[in-house]
């Protein structure tokens, strides 16, 4: 086992075939996210599941209606929402998507607050802390992103929100070792055991919902 000691390390958000092949070497399990901006393509999902096994629907800046329809029609897939629109973030949490990923990107705040954190706990919605935005930002942007991630982590820790650390790799060069994701967790305020749990225990809890 990659994680060792019976621990499975899980990469929850890989967005590219070559990235998947590399991540498979470094993680015990890998979830491939298929990105949709508008209507979800059933055939594309079926092909992805056949090829990769564990698949998530990634709704990028969706309208609330797309979130609603996806949650209703695709319960056997993980559903992630990536948006900086608070209205969409709240609606997605209320509808019970599996995860909100990096809501602080292109915002001037963490994208969640105490109210949303409590709602995430109630609806079993996880918060995904993605490394990728940090890789493609200038020093000023990176400092702000880290500041918002630290604030989000404090809310996650306080209210015991489900969480995971991920590379969100869109090409193989974005994939990172488990230890790198653990280091990201430490940088934003996690203790090492908390960071390890964010690529092992919490992803396992999230994956239990899948109905293949």
Curated annotation (Swiss-Prot):
InterPro entries: Pol/histidinol_Pase-like (IPR016195), RNase_P_comp-3_arc (IPR023539), RNase_P_p30 (IPR002738). It comes from Pyrococcus horikoshii (strain ATCC 700860 / DSM 12428 / JCM 9974 / NBRC 100139 / OT-3). It holds the Pfam family RNase_P_p30. It catalyses: Endonucleolytic cleavage of RNA, removing 5'-extranucleotides from tRNA precursor. Changing residue 176 to A: 45% reconstituted RNase P activity. Part of ribonuclease P, a protein complex that generates mature tRNA molecules by cleaving their 5'-ends. Not absolutely essential for activity in vitro, however it strongly stimulates activity. Binds RNase P RNA. The keyword Cell wall biogenesis/degradation does not apply. The lineage of its organism: Archaea, Methanobacteriati, Methanobacteriota, Thermococci, Thermococcales. This is Ribonuclease P protein component 3. The gene is rnp3. It is an enzyme of class 3 (hydrolase). GO terms for cellular component: cytoplasm; ribonuclease P complex. Signal peptide: none annotated. It is found in: Cytoplasm. Keywords: Cytoplasm, Endonuclease, Hydrolase, Nuclease, tRNA processing.
């Amino acid at each position: 086992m990659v994680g060792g000691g019976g621990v499975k390390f899980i990469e929850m958000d890989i967005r590219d075939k070559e990235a998947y092949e590399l991540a498979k070497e470094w993680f015990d399990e890998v979830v491939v996210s298929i990105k949709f901006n508008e209507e979800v393509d059933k055939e594309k999902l079926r092909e992805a599941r056949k090829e990769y096994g564990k698949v998530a629907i990634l709704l990028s800046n969706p309208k609330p209606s797309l979130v609603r329809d996806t949650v209703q029609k695709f319960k056997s897939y993980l559903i992630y929402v990536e948006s900086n629109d608070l209205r969409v973030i709240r609606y997605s949490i209320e509808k019970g998507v599996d995860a909100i990923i990096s809501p602080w990107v292109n915002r001037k705040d963490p994208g969640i607050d105490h109210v949303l954190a409590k709602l995430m706990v109630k609806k079993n919605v996880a918060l995904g802390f993605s490394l990728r935005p940090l890789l493609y930002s200038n020093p000023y942007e990176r400092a702000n992103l880290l500041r918002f991630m630290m604030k989000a982590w404090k809310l996650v820790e306080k209210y015991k929100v489900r969480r995971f650390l991920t590379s969100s790799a869109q090409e193989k060069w974005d994939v990172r070792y488990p230890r790198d994701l653990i280091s990201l967790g430490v940088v934003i305020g996690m203790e090492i055991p908390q960071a390890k749990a964010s690529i092992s225990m919490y992803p396992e809890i999230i994956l239990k919902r899948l109905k293949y």
